[in-house]
Curated annotation (Swiss-Prot):
Organism for this UniProt entry: Escherichia coli (strain SMS-3-5 / SECEC)
Family: Belongs to the UPF0213 family.
InterPro entries attached to this UniProt entry: GIY-YIG_endonuc, GIY-YIG_endonuc_sf, UPF0213_domain, UPF0213_GIY-YIG_endonuc
Name the UniProt record assigns to this protein: UPF0213 protein YhbQ
Highest rank taxon of the organism: Bacteria
Domain (GIY-YIG): residue spans on this chain: 2-77
Length: 100
């Protein structure tokens, strides 16, 4: 099973873009060359600000969604310190118990 990664890219105007991939360097190069997400095209110089392995695709999608819900301040803490990332992953891996 190929591991999936969550990554954040910083644009020239200091915005953070969140994505997932199985190959961070390849995906970053795609964004740099303008062949990645439309949201990053024409945004100037891009910098890979954060990346971390998250497990399988399902978990990566859930982690991406959760990170996209964070405030800019929380994302900056994640980039600077990895603050809360382990807890975020742990909360996504906790099995949900269905009640009848």
């Amino acid at each position: 099973m190929t591991p999936w990664f969550l990554y954040l890219i910083r644009t020239a105007d200091n915005k953070l873009y969140t994505g997932i991939t199985t190959d961070v360097e390849r995906r970053y190069q795609q964004h740099q060359s303008g062949k990645g997400a439309k949201a990053l095209r024409g945004k100037g110089e891009l910098t890979l600000a954060f990346s971390a392995p998250v497990g399988d695709r399902s978990l990566a999608l859930r982690a991406e969604y959760r990170v996209k819900q964070l405030t800019k301040r929380q994302k900056e803490r994640l980039v600077a310190e990895g603050a809360g990332f382990a807890e975020l992953l742990s909360s996504l891996q906790t099995p949900k118990i269905k009640s009848d």
